[in-house]
From Swiss-Prot:
UniProt xrefs under Gene3D superfamilies: 1.20.1270.20, 3.40.50.2030
Protein name (record): Hydroxylamine reductase
Keyword Iron-sulfur set for record: yes
Native source organism of the sequence: Edwardsiella ictaluri (strain 93-146)
Annotated family: Belongs to the HCP family.
Cofactor remark from the record: Binds 1 [2Fe-2S] cluster. Binds 1 hybrid [4Fe-2O-2S] cluster.
The entry's keywords: 2Fe-2S, Cytoplasm, Iron, Iron-sulfur, Metal-binding, Oxidoreductase
Residues the entry annotates as binding [2Fe-2S] cluster: C3, C6, C18, C25
Length: 551
């Protein structure tokens, strides 16, 4: 195996990347290799989808399947080799159907792509693993060099993150022919193993720009379905009674679970990136959506073990449920998979509900502890004039966007310490699961505004970006001239594509941590610093003084 896509990848003087029997995430070498083969199959599919478009042939089923299957290769999503092979077979079957349609419309049509005629060379896993070696992501690294390899990975992993957001939008009924075409373009291009540095950098920015449109699409889908998020208090302590925990990002799954449990006396708790769901009017109207349980995804083996009911995983992040001995109580949905864990097909949650009814549930209610969520795009934009007034009156010195992915490294305490150190005349916006480092602390208010504003899930960076754009327009300045600084934490591929989106939009001087991506060389980091001012976090005092010294 060779995998370097997440923040916890193995790092050694000889090179970075997980390359042993098992990755740091728990992914087996077998599954990792088969995911490489799946990616190649999806690149073959995209090559034919592009050619089909030239002949005015489009297939919505294929366009939605491709990013969904790609999503299965993200960190902590699908560890089930059998399902990965199934996706690869399905991709090539769809590819062949496109080939047939193209030949029927234009006999003699040929696809000039190195993966156009890719075939799986066997039925058994061992044979497919041997074939997968041809598509290992580092197979030509010695030939092309670490810089080109790193830029390829930047685009590949960024496109993975964009594919995940495409799937989230698709679930909510959002489609865009322009986005599908762009996705297939970048996917097919990556299948050619590009080697030109300028093209690789340009296309990485192109993927970031495309993702901005995807996030807008997802924002539209969520707000049309569930209303604009508004500030809402959420209890983070359990209540007595039967219970179900839902984790991941899929608000549609939460909606269906709430509908199917309504009136049954079962309390539903959100976990991880589901926390922002409480801000949506059409979700919080369900009285049995009673609160949020737990913290960042990396703590789930301890927290899920203590949860006295079933757990539903709707997207990333799942880790080995056997460690906490709750594998009989966890269920997977959609693209999520773990060997031996029960997977739900369709939208019937009756098996999960039945299990909740026989589980013990919480024996008593704990003392309530409320936190506030729901500072979505509309709420932020409505507050823009107040922010401008506070800045003009010199009552608001600076705004910090402090958030991103959480993880297990000790260095992530930086984000807790940074939040605590931010002066009282500054606001803090936060998003994604990195907020769990400090979202239960008390930050008070600034002239009536809460100092801590929970913007939402990772994709809700869109709302923060739109606030920045709106403020810049009203103040007649550029985004980089605002009293705004971004201090981001990363772990996986959604964070990579959000970073690419910010860079593509011209946002500069972003602080990132806790470590640099393992696929980015010192030379590439220097290029990103030179072009965009992107820099690594250092110490809280040094970074805070560096920012406010210029504020």
């Amino acid at each position: 195996m060779y995998c370097v896509q997440c923040e916890q990848t193995i790092r050694t003087p000889a090179g970075n990347g997980c390359s042993y029997a098992q990755g740091m995430c728990g992914k087996s070498a077998e599954t990792s290799d088969l995911q490489d083969l799946l990616v190649a199959a999806l690149q073959s599919l995209s090559a034919w989808a592009l050619l089909a478009r030239e002949l005015d042939i489009r297939d919505r089923t294929i366009d939605s399947f491709a990013p969904r299957a790609f999503f299965a290769t993200l960190t902590n999503v699908n560890f089930d080799s059998a399902r990965i092979i199934g996706y690869a077979r399905e991709a090539l079957a769809m590819r062949d159907s496109l080939r047939t349609a193209c030949l029927a419309k234009a006999p003699g049509t040929q696809c000039d792509h190195p993966l156009a005629d890719l075939r799986l060379q066997g039925e058994d896993v061992a044979t497919l693993r041997r074939q997968a070696a041809e598509f290992a992501l580092d197979s030509d690294r010695a030939e092309i060099g670490d810089d080109i390899h790193g830029l390829r990975m930047l685009s590949l992993y960024g496109l993975k993150g964009a594919a995940a957001y495409m799937e989230h939008a698709h679930v909510l009924g959002q489609h865009s022919e322009a986005i599908y075409a762009q996705y297939h373009h970048y996917m097919a291009w990556l299948g050619t193993r590009p080697c030109d540095m300028d093209t690789l950098l340009d296309n990485a920015m192109g993927i970031g720009k495309m993702n901005f449109a995807i996030m807008a699409q997802l924002d539209k889908g969520e707000t049309e379905a569930y209303g604009d998020p508004t500030p809402t208090s959420v209890n983070v302590r359990p209540l007595a009674g039967k219970c179900i925990l839902i984790s991941g990002h899929d608000l549609k799954d939460l909606q269906m679970l709430l509908e199917q449990t309504d009136g049954l006396g079962i309390n539903v708790y959100t976990h991880g990136e589901m926390l922002p769901a409480h801000g949506y009017p059409e979700l919080r109207k369900y009285r049995h959506l009673v609160g949020n349980y737990g913290s960042g995804w990396q703590n789930q083996q301890q927290e899920f073990a203590r949860f006295p009911g079933p757990i539903l995983m709707t997207s990333n992040c799942i880790i080995d449920p056997n460690v906490g001995n709750y594998s009989d109580r966890i269920w997977t949905r959609s693209i999520v998979g773990w060997p031996g864990v029960r997977h739900l097909e369709g939208d019937d949650f009756s098996q999960v509900i039945a299990q909740a009814q026989v589980c013990d549930g919480f024996p008593y209610s704990e003392i309530e502890h409320l936190i506030t969520v729901g500072f979505g795009r509309a709420t932020l934009l409505n507050a823009a004039d107040s922010v401008i007034d506070l800045v003009a009156q010199k009552k608001l010195r600076h705004v910090f966007l402090l958030g991103g992915c959480d993880g297990s490294r000790d260095e992530r305490s930086y984000y807790t310490d940074f939040a605590r150190a931010i002066p009282q005349d500054c606001l803090i916006m936060t998003l994604a699961c990195g907020k769990y480092r400090f979202n239960k602390l008390e930050f008070g208010t600034l002239e009536g505004l809460p100092r801590l504003l929970d913007v939402g899930q990772c994709n809700d960076a869109y709302g923060a970006i739109m606030l920045a754009v709106n403020l810049a327009e009203k103040l007649g300045c550029g985004i980089n001239d605002l009293p705004l600084s971004l201090i981001l934490s990363w772990f996986e591929q959604k964070a990579i594509v959000i970073l690419l989106t910010l860079l593509a939009l011209g946002v500069k001087n972003i602080y990132t941590g806790p470590t640099a991506p393992g696929f980015l060389t010192d030379n590439l980091l220097a290029i990103l610093n030179q072009r965009f001012g992107m820099r690594a976090i250092s110490t809280v005092d040094a970074d805070l003084n560096g920012i406010l010294g210029h504020a």
